[in-house]
Amino acid sequence: MNNPQLTTVWSSVMVEELIRQGASFFCISPGSRSTPLTAAIARNPEASWKMFPDERSAGFFALGHARATGFPAVLVCTSGTAVANYLPAVVEASNDRIPMLILSADRPFELRECGANQTIRQNGIFGTFTRWQMELPEPSTSIPLQSLLSTIAHGVEKSLNSPRGPVHLNQPFREPFEPESCSTPEPWLEPLQAWQTGRRPSTVAAQPEKHPDMDSMRTLRELTGNARQPLIIAGNSTDENDSHAIAELADDLQVPLYADMTSGLRFSSSILPWQQAFASPEFRNAFRPDLVIHFGGGLISRHPSDALKQWKPDHLAVIRNHPGRYSPDHSVTLSIEASLRLTADALRGCRTGASALMAPAKRFFTEADREIAAATAPDLPVSEIGTARIVSELLPPDHLLFLSNSMPVRAMDSYAHTGKENPIKTGTNRGASGIDGIISTAAGFAEGHGQPLCLMIGDLAFLHDLNALSLINSLRVPIQLILLNNNGGGIFSFLPVSEFDDIFEPNFATPQNFSGRPAAAMFGLDYTAPLTNSEFRESLLSALNSNRSTIIEVVCSRSENVRLHRALQARLGLLATEAFFIP
């Protein structure tokens, strides 16, 4: 067996085992050193793949795809800076515990750290952001192929086991790279005969749900049963079963449930949008729970965190399904690592009688809904608030939603309409909360689900990932991209630094003065720019009923946006004061 044949077999075995382990979608960036891997993927009938000239975009697409499917998409690249471009997506996947597998091709031993072209130190390049990383050997008949299978299987297992996250396998190859088949029997391949003729993976790994321990549950049930005023918080969660169980628990106990946008519950007709009450300082002063039970990860709004610092509840219990720490304010009194669903189920029935807050809460949210509707009346200029409200009203059940960080996700978290019988599947990048790679992640999310998607994105995040617009028309499904163009970093206008005129505009707002129209034309996308809420509603309905992808650009003023947000929050604060009888 010559070297090309050896490399071909080696790469084919790797790709086949990845597919059998469930990692069957590959994000490939063109390159010479990775030729054996690309050829093996292209020639495997069970593989699905997409080509990416930009590795950075590929990394975020893989992230979105894994968010949708629950399985790692495999990133394949050549040597050099190609692999370094994955780092932002790897950081997000690590922080948000999303499975990911990087398969980077590399130079062999004799070409490393000697001045050879396109060669960097790739092994360990992602540092602490991987769950596992391994320098694979150069293909050799002296290495049993069973060890290669076992290593691939372990890599996928490490990506999927708690805590989920990225795995990096660095594979050196020697030239030549072109595939060459081997027709003669090889003793080296004989131990793999059963594997080659079957369809099962070499190793089957289980990922069981972790049950909460009995002592912790006994304590938590007792605290919940005896609490004067409990509060349940549903934070970032990627599992629909977890979300449903938390909602059912709150209904069973008849206590308030603060459901963050990332919890999967925000749009549900059975959930009250407590964000609108928590924004009121008067409400936060009056509502003082003595027990807070926090399921899942972080929250978008800072108001619950501010409230916790103010309340200092007797007990703050955090339930998360991974071993990572979640205690941003260092006030957790009970920490449970277990399945969110199983923990929520185990808490049911430990309390009787509805919270005194529930009746006035329903009155408040009815009035708040009317106030938001008035602020987004059809003839008013379209704004970030109106955009979020209308999108949440119009999205059909078969559509996905992806929200960019900064203002889009906050506007939706605060003002979304509740009333969906089947909550919209919503994606965000809240692991590290960056604005990079948003279009790429949304495209991967849509492709992974195989459903049309609506993306809300700000102008700076749009520019940051502009080249990813080239992906949209190659997807199986259309995307409605809502570009909130306030000519700069709108979120900074809410911060104290905005009062310093001499430094704010050029150094924080950073206006870019561009339109999305030329970008739509360049990448073959439809385009519209509505001016009023009524026009935006019509544009969105038209886009939702089309099989073409569209950019809907909403041009708005940063200063006017701040005024609208603050005016509406003030009116909601007055309603909260009246509804909850705050003196």
Swiss-Prot record:
Coiled coil: none annotated. Its EC number is 2.2.1.9. One of its GO terms (biological process) is menaquinone biosynthetic process. It comes from the Bacteria. Its cofactor is Mg(2+); Mn(2+); thiamine diphosphate. The keyword Magnesium applies. It is an enzyme of class 2 (transferase). It catalyses: isochorismate + 2-oxoglutarate + H(+) = 5-enolpyruvoyl-6-hydroxy-2-succinyl-cyclohex-3-ene-1-carboxylate + CO2. Pathway: Quinol/quinone metabolism; 1,4-dihydroxy-2-naphthoate biosynthesis; 1,4-dihydroxy-2-naphthoate from chorismate: step 2/7; Quinol/quinone metabolism; menaquinone biosynthesis. CDD domains: TPP_PYR_MenD, TPP_SHCHC_synthase. InterPro entries: CHASE_dom, DHS-like_NAD/FAD-binding_dom, MenaQ_synth_MenD, MenD_middle, THDP-binding, Thiamin_PyroP_enz_TPP-bd_dom, TPP_enzyme_TPP-bd. One of its GO terms (molecular function) is manganese ion binding. Keywords: Magnesium, Manganese, Menaquinone biosynthesis, Metal-binding, Thiamine pyrophosphate, Transferase. The keyword Manganese applies. Binds 1 thiamine pyrophosphate per subunit. Belongs to the TPP enzyme family. MenD subfamily. Catalyzes the thiamine diphosphate-dependent decarboxylation of 2-oxoglutarate and the subsequent addition of the resulting succinic semialdehyde-thiamine pyrophosphate anion to isochorismate to yield 2-succinyl-5-enolpyruvyl-6-hydroxy-3-cyclohexene-1-carboxylate (SEPHCHC). NCBIfam families: menD. Homodimer. HAMAP family: MenD. This is 2-succinyl-5-enolpyruvyl-6-hydroxy-3-cyclohexene-1-carboxylate synthase.
